[in-house]
């Protein structure tokens, strides 16, 4: 929508996007994520992208921006989606503010994508178990390995995303409000059918993608 005002604060601005107002963090002039985010809020934004939430001040402003009706997108350095929520709590964000402002958490990893020249990799069950596979995962398990050809050189071509997509369900919200930890949030996510990063990666491997 041409009328939608999309503004970002990034460190650094890696890609210039037409139609989007982008600001780069610059510590030399005290342009931090928090200060840039405050400046963005004075420009009547519809969508805000904060490159990274690194401290409590930035987290608080991002949460308040969400609570006042803005769509806020950001990143945190954590191991998976449940730990992202725990990270916000550990930073000092009140649980009720998290449940009121956060709607979706996505954890991402990138793996090398196997090229079409791949070939089946047949390993004995003992080797797979030694690599961390569970016995219940070995049935009809087919993995692949890189070969290499004129189209890829080393058997790989690009990257494939491995994701954990965790909506903030009512069950997860209750755990957050009760002061629960990342392990409890992860258990609730599994019970609601949300695959973790390991399960997502295993599916991509079975599909011959990585």
Indicate where each model-derived feature is located.
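Short, flexible helix-loop junctions that flank or precede catalytic/ligand sites
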Residues: 1-210
